[in-house]
Amino acid sequence: MNKWTGLSAAAVLESRAQHGANLIPTKKLTPFWLLFLEQFKSLVVILLLVATILSLVVAIISGVNANWLFDHNLVIEWTQPFVILITVLANSLIGSIQEFKAQKSAHTLKSLTQPFTRVFREEGLVSLPVGEVVVGDIIFLEAGDIIPADGKVLQANHLRCMESFLTGESVPVDKSVVNTGGKGLLEQTNLLFSGAQVVFGSGVFEVTAVGLNTQVGQIVKTVDSSATKLSPLQQKLEKVGKWFSWFGLGLFVVVFLVQLGLLGFHNFSANWSIALIGAIALVVAIIPEGLVTFINVIFALSVQKLTKQKAIIKYLAAIETLGGVQIICTDKTGTLTQNKMKVVDYFCFSNTTQTDLARALCLCNNATVNTNGDSTGDPTEIALLQWLDRDGLELNHYTRVYEKAFDSNRKLMSVVVQKDNRFIVIVKGAHDVLLPLCKGLDSNQIKPLIDERASNGLRNLAVGLKVLYCFDPENTQTVNELESELDFLGSVSLQDPPRIESKAAIMACHQANITPIMITGDHLKTATAIAKELGILTDERQAILGVDLDPAKIMEYRVFARVTPQQKLEIVNAWKQAGYTVAVTGDGVNDAPALVTSDVGCCMGQTGVDIAKDAADVIISDDNFATIVNGIEQGRKTFLTCKRVLFNLFLTSIAGTIVVLLGLFVLGEVFREQLSKANHNFQVFTPTQLLIINLFVHGFPAVALAIQPVQEKLMLKPFSTKNLFYNRGGFDLIWQSLLLSFLTLLFYSLGMVYAINDPELGKSGDLINRAGATCGFMVLGGSAALNSLNLMVDRPLVATNPKHYGIVWLGALSSIFVFLLIIFINPLGLVFSTLKDLTAHPVLIGYSFGGVLLYMTINEVVKLIRLSYGSV
């Protein structure tokens, strides 16, 4: 080591100035306040904030002009803007809190990197933080070290590195001063890459790239420049929200001007606030205020469930996208398999005993396995030691006197051990190399067995030995003759076996119309064998090597072996461009571009590197494919729940808009004489009433729907998130909205007629309107609350078991209870503009509940008719 002369202090400074520091910026946590502010980018939220400001202006000006300081109307006017504002803030808090929690969960899973490395500088070999390494530095490496930067090998003493995080190759790579590999950058054996681990030997290399200029750094830059993904539902809701907002804004202007004209432009100062409140009420009716809030609540509850199931969702919307996945491009090692080599079979030749084979494998082995399970060394050698029962082998009687390390050219490892006056040569390696070195052996006897195991994806190691009575390690001729005239002992077969639950998870994918695709850096035979065993592959013609891949035929294959990161990206893009929703699993730096490009990137939490975790949308903390499938099922449930809640939201928005419009211009004209005599400016529903309907009516059922277990077998049938209201959904929304608006107006009118004819109520236009509003308020809100039960099942409610939907029943009845509090408790009735002392008017109570029962009855009749025609 003393022959290496390192950089001087001046050269270090010059190199750092020219090439930069050896640092890769980690993705910082987005501050909570910034996440909170980002929630306000929605046009719906902006419009609601404008409505808040306008309502506040009206409250202040009206209060000052009318001297309402001690009037109950001041409370009513001030309630409206703050209810709208609380709605906006609640939504923003829910979304930002959950995303911040998910960020922190993902951040805690990041792995710790080696902080120091050994560098030759002008003062000799020193230990320095990896961040101080510069281009031109000479680095010393030995087993266990993490390579701190990219570089070129200067000296290699049986140097072997694990580069699976970058290349996908599951076995260590032999490194040498001269390239003995391919021409591709990652195939060159004389190059080292930042983040790789030295698993055997030692070496020296010169740093050629640091920080963002390393191979890892280049991938980081690709990941950081990626755009934020929107889920299919988010994309639809963004369009729907804009449509509702612009439509509402247009109607706001029209209704304000028309109503002002009807009231009289000549008295603008007295009438503008009345017209403005009516227009704001219309905007509040049109905009489904709970649109974002309830979706975030449903997403958050689903995310919590999945966190308990070992899946950490970094972004709320990813849960819904996961439910719509049609293609899963999954890695093999560690995801479908256990990421742990195991001996699955062995063969003892002739008179060899299992003890003989075991002893030879222990002696020709450089790995260590402690009693507590900790291990170091080559994964294959570790697997051999874990398989063997070393008790009784008397290994302490043998002393190793010589080793000829494994290298990729010879494909052999040899050791000489001494016991008493005998020297025993033990050789292990590939069958095709070792069998010809054995004496008295017809390799054709062994070859069929080995070929069969190889075709099943097993890695086979042959073992041979011979006994010498003298051995001189300094004698070159003796050393060269070691690997000859061997006695064949037998062989062992190893495999990274599939996880127990993987096969069932793959079967669940097929049943759910999801296509699993294996993309691996491993060998084709190994990948094919595992894929066939798990059910991914039925025809071997659907498996292909990366070098043979034709981009135009990507969708014909189900297994891709020995692929490059660029090819993995091409595979993902091919399926996406064909219109499929694609999930990708990965754990290495090489997987990061595909994780970003996919619709849902799933990174393994245990084996995943930080860059892959940053790129992913979901972190699978138990590295299990079955967890991804569980996530898809939860995602489907989430989408179904969102669809049901959105149906109810749109139902009340459409019905409420129709009621407010027709109420202002039809009921206002019909009852003009009675209202004008009573000196009252007519208004159908206040903004506060509509907000109560849009929030509390849907709030409890929305949470209940999210918690309620879904009875449908969602993973046993095709599923799509492409259409929000498919299978009659759009038609049902239209006719139910028309029905609900008709019934609301009908019972609103009946309530007003009753009040007009009542000796006490008929004296006040305000009381006449409150009587109608009480009935209409209950019909619109109560019907929407109970409609959540209708949405749970296609069959009539009378034909279902209430126990199966107990949580939704509780949610619906909780909403009804809120309405009862408002209409029966006088102070609340005052604030929300309903009639006080309703118990004195049982007819109005009958109207209120009669309209709800009529709506539900008509829905039940429609279901019965559909059931009789077999269209449910």
From Swiss-Prot:
* Residue positions binding Mg(2+): 587, 591
- Give residue spans on the Extracellular membrane side: 63-79, 258-275, 663-685, 748-768, 825-842
Q: Which family does it belong to?
A: Belongs to the cation transport ATPase (P-type) (TC 3.A.3) family. Type II subfamily.
Which EC class is the enzyme in?
A: translocase
Q: How does it sit in the membrane?
A: Multi-pass membrane protein
Which keywords does this chain's UniProt record carry? ATP-binding, Cell membrane, Magnesium, Membrane, Metal-binding, Nucleotide-binding, Phosphoprotein, Translocase, Transmembrane, Transmembrane helix
Q: What does this protein do?
A: Could mediate calcium influx.
Active site: residue positions: 331
Annotated InterPro entries:
ATPase_P-typ_cation-transptr_C, ATPase_P-typ_cation-transptr_N, ATPase_P-typ_cyto_dom_N, ATPase_P-typ_P_site, ATPase_P-typ_TM_dom_sf, ATPase_P-typ_transduc_dom_A_sf, HAD-like_sf, HAD_sf
> Where is this chain's protein located in or outside the cell?
Cell membrane
MF terms per GO, please?
ATP binding; ATP hydrolysis activity; metal ion binding
Name the reaction it catalyses: ATP + H2O = ADP + phosphate + H(+)
- Where does the chain cross the membrane? 42-62, 80-100, 238-257, 276-293, 643-662, 686-706, 725-747, 769-788, 802-824, 843-863
The UniProt record lists the EC number as 7.2.2.-
GO cellular component labels = plasma membrane
**Which organism encodes this protein?**
Mycoplasma pneumoniae (strain ATCC 29342 / M129 / Subtype 1)
Per the record, ranges on the Cytoplasmic side are 1-41, 101-237, 294-642, 707-724, 789-801, 864-872
Gene name of this polypeptide: pacL
Protein name, as recorded? Probable cation-transporting P-type ATPase
